[in-house]
Amino acid sequence: MKLLHIDSSILGDNSASRQLSSQVTKAWQAAEPSAVVTYRDLAADAISHFSSTTLVAAGTTAELRNAAQQHEAELSATTLAEFITADAIVVAAPMYNFTVPTQLKAWIDRIAVAGQTFRYTEAGPEGLCGGKKVVIVSTAGGIHAGQASGVAHEDYLKLVFGFLGITDIEVVRAEGLAYGEEVRNNAMSAAQAKISEQLFAAA
């Protein structure tokens, strides 16, 4: 089994999403000792956003690309291959201004590729990544579940992965992390309990 672990928070060791995603990955490895983990830190090693260079590189043969275009082509190919070959993905997704971090959006733009992870048919778009499992580690300073704002970044990620054909999606959520120490501790404890008692209870 191949497990892809994605972090995207800019907070380093102070990040709740990083702490929880690490726990998910460790629990997964304990449940499946043969799992091979690929780790990508999108904050420390950011993926560049789409640009005209990215698009030109995709439509230019390798021998005709300049250095910048070749870099973009290799980055796209490596990022896509990591996703396609993964059996499961752990995505740490803190809420930044009601959506995902820009670093995570840049990664999504590299994996949502027509003809590779989805295709268009006469009946509409069809995801090509069925069979994968995704665990979204969702964190937020505020409390959004059940509120007018909703948990927008979770909904977005579910939409993206669903579009790619992935239906096995679990969410580990810790919110209200900026509401004081007691609320934060309770939220983290609840998320940790879900990881150990629900996601991997049978392990």
Swiss-Prot record:
Cofactor(s) for this UniProt protein: FMN
Free-text comment on the cofactor: Binds 1 FMN per subunit.
Catalytic activity: 2 a quinone + NADH + H(+) = 2 a 1,4-benzosemiquinone + NAD(+); N,N-dimethyl-1,4-phenylenediamine + anthranilate + 2 NAD(+) = 2-(4-dimethylaminophenyl)diazenylbenzoate + 2 NADH + 2 H(+)
Known EC number: 1.6.5.-, 1.7.1.17
GO molecular function per UniProt: electron transfer activity; FMN binding; oxidoreductase activity, acting on NAD(P)H as acceptor; oxidoreductase activity, acting on NAD(P)H, quinone or similar compound as acceptor
Keyword vocabulary terms for this entry: Flavoprotein, FMN, NAD, Oxidoreductase
Presence of the UniProt keyword Ubl conjugation in the record: no
Residues at which FMN binds: 9, 15-17, 95-98, 139-142
Cytoplasm is among the record's keywords: no
Annotated function: Quinone reductase that provides resistance to thiol-specific stress caused by electrophilic quinones.
Record family assignment: Belongs to the azoreductase type 1 family.
HAMAP family on file: Azoreductase_type1 (MF_01216)
Quaternary structure annotation from Swiss-Prot or TrEMBL: Homodimer.
Protein name in UniProt: FMN-dependent NADH:quinone oxidoreductase 3
Gene: azoR3
